[in-house]
């Protein structure tokens, strides 16, 4: 009888993470039971890797067609012992300038004040418009939802116009809620 740990090794591919580390795995379409019409982001895939591969939730890697994918917690496959791990993959279709607010304490008021922004590079993410909500002056403000593998924080600035409102850690990735200008050039590819 064949060893189940070797099944699929002949059809696996080499992928490269955004930090340059290589790993081997298979990229599969999810079963119909895992696809819903209420999916929030672009079509998902399933990444199946050997149990010893160095792949974790939140890892970003390049797909075979040149796009980037983000791994999130899915499940493991067992036959007496763990033989493989699977991750859900969200296609990262946006790359945005990412900045973090620099603060200092005002000596007079003893309150925090923003003294500039620290550039954190480019943030690969998937993002979608959710709704317009009114601010205190009844001016409609667009709201967005973003998913990424980086440690973004409330108050971070994306593309000089979008502010991170709230961040939650869900299935091993960061889900952020944003507010900002209507995104034309920044949101469109």
Across the structure, where does each feature detected by a protein language model lie?
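Short, conserved turn/kink motifs that form compact alpha/beta structural patches or helix kinks used as
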Residues: 19-189
